[in-house]
């Protein structure tokens, strides 16, 4: 039975919602009234483009205006991020946020902006596990054997990454610290050349997003030792979690959506609901699963909380590794 107090509280909440919606309608009679720019701060291709284009197409269909993907790569995502922060806070310029934003806050001491103050969280999109892959000729078949081999051969292992300061690089640094092993870090310009050299034996291993390596594992061209999330990946179900051996080890990549700070909360709320609805669509969910990713759900405040947690998590890893942008 609903009490009088509960009824009055619900009525007040409903009235406040109606008032906010009315104010939104007066100040923003038809958002969106023209095309919306969705900035991806990376070069075309890969999971970032697939996820962005999936969501932009669905938002275009649902909201009646075109959501256009604009790739603005450079400086580890900083160029695109800074461009969005400098844009008008009107909902017509959005940013595909990522792990790089959480890392750069502490990795780059000369960062020309404050991400936490410059971007309004809109919605989470997906989380992607990483996987430790090694050359097939390396005489190890598990995380425990890899650690034992590294300890028995200090400094002889080389581990690739997609670049200094990336989640792939820092996952390796965290692994080194937690496992008490040493190996040489070899940065590449992206995952593809690093994976190529792991397959050839030029380097012995690599932490990589499952999205770009699972097919090589399935084809038998690489050996997967463990995923970096606490749970196994649906796309590599036979690969255990690294945390099963190295208790407490956990990293991943994530993607979300942000807007310039001071974007009206009504617009943020609308976009959040539409993105969340899109992520619940069976077709989109399947496409995300096929990438090896996990859809993220929740309101804007929850995504903001996740960004805060991720930034703090990666700050600890950066401090532990001592790595800084030069």
Can you say where each PLM-predicted feature lies in the sequence?
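N-terminal (or domain-start) structured segment
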Residues: 25-116, 156, 181-204, 297, ...
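N-terminal signal peptide c-region/cleavage motif recognized by signal peptidases
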Residues: 20-22
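Short loop/turn segments at beta->alpha junctions
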Residues: 3, 142, 187-190, 209, ...
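Beta->alpha turn/N-cap motifs
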Residues: 96-101, 161, 191, 207-213, ...
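N-terminal secretory signal peptides and thylakoid transit peptides that target proteins
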Residues: 1-14
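An extracytoplasmic/periplasmic, membrane-proximal ligand-sensing/linker region
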Residues: 33-35, 177-178, 218, 265-326
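Hinge/capping helix and adjacent helix->loop/strand transition within the periplasmic-binding protein
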Residues: 86-91, 106-193, 242, 254-287
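C-terminal lobe and pocket-closing loops
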Residues: 127, 212-280, 312
């Amino acid at each position: 039975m609903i009490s009088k107090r509960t009824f009055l509280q619900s009525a007040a909440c409903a009235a406040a919602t109606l008032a906010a919606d009315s104010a939104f309608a007066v100040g923003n009679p038809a958002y969106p009234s023209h095309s919306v720019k969705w900035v991806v701060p990376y070069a075309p291709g890969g999971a970032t483009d697939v996820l962005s284009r999936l969501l932009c197409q669905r938002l275009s269909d649902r909201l009646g205006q075109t959501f256009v993907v604009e790739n603005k790569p450079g400086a580890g995502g900083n160029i695109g991020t800074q461009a969005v922060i400098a844009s008008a806070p009107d909902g017509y310029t959005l940013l595909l946020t990522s792990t790089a934003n959480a890392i750069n806050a502490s990795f780059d001491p000369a960062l020309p902006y404050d991400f936490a103050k410059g971007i309004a969280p809109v919605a989470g999109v997906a989380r992607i596990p990483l996987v430790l892959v090694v050359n097939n000729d390396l005489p190890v078949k598990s995380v425990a054997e890899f650690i034992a081999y590294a300890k028995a051969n200090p400094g002889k292992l080389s581990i690739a990454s997609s670049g200094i300061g990336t989640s792939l690089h820092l996952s390796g640094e965290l692994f080194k610290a937690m496992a008490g092993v040493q190996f040489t870090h070899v940065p590449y310009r992206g995952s593809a050349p690093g994976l190529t050299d792991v397959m050839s034996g030029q380097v012995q291993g690599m932490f990589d997003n499952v999205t770009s390596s699972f097919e090589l594992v399935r084809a038998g061209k690489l050996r997967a030792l463990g995923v970096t999330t606490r749970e196994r990946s649906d796309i590599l179900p036979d690969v255990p979690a690294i945390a099963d051996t190295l208790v407490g080890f956990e990293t991943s990549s994530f993607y979300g959506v942000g807007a310039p700070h001071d974007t009206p909360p009504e617009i943020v709320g609308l976009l959040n609901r539409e993105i969340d609805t899109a992520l619940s669509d069976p077709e989109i969910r399947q496409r995300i699963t096929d990438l090896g990713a996990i859809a993220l759900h929740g309101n804007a405040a929850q995504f903001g909380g996740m960004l805060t947690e991720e930034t703090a998590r990666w700050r600890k890893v950066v401090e532990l590794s001592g790595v800084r942008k030069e």
